[in-house]
C-alpha cells in the first residue's frame, strides 16, 4: 500500500531562482477586490495571502509559473504577467 502524496513535500523539492531586479508579475495600483479574493483561493502556490486587515499581500517568489493568476486576473488585478527572464524562475524537480 502506498502512502498519500504530500503536496508541500513535492513542491519543496523545486528550485526557485528569483529575479529580484525584474518581477514577472505586478499587481495593479488599485486592483479589483473581488479579483484578489479569487486569486487568494486559486493560486496553487499560495502566493496571494489575505491579511488580518482584509488587504491581500502578494510575493512573486515561489511562483510556479502556471498562469492561473494571468487567466483569472490579468484585466482586473494584474498590471503585468510574463514568464521570468532566461535562467530565472522555477526549476521543477521530481523526487
Curated annotation (Swiss-Prot):
InterPro entries: Fd_FixX. GO terms for molecular function: 4 iron, 4 sulfur cluster binding; iron ion binding. The keyword Hydrolase does not apply. Keywords: 4Fe-4S, Electron transport, Iron, Iron-sulfur, Metal-binding, Transport. The keyword Disulfide bond does not apply. NCBIfam families: PRK15449.1 (NF011993). Could be part of an electron transfer system required for anaerobic carnitine reduction. Could be a 3Fe-4S cluster-containing protein. Belongs to the bacterial-type ferredoxin family. FixX subfamily. This is Ferredoxin-like protein FixX. It comes from Salmonella typhi.
Amino acid at each position: 500500500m502506498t502512502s498519500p502524496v504530500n503536496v508541500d513535500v513535492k513542491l519543496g523539492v523545486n528550485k526557485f531562482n528569483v529575479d529580484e531586479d525584474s518581477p514577472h508579475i505586478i499587481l495593479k495600483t488599485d486592483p479589483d477586490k473581488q479579483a484578489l479574493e479569487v486569486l487568494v483561493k486559486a493560486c496553487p502556490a499560495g502566493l496571494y495571502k489575505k491579511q488580518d486587515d482584509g488587504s491581500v499581500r502578494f510575493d512573486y517568489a515561489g511562483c510556479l509559473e502556471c498562469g492561473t493568476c494571468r487567466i483569472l486576473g490579468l484585466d482586473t488585478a494584474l498590471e503585468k504577467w510574463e514568464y521570468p527572464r532566461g535562467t530565472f524562475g522555477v526549476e521543477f524537480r521530481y523526487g
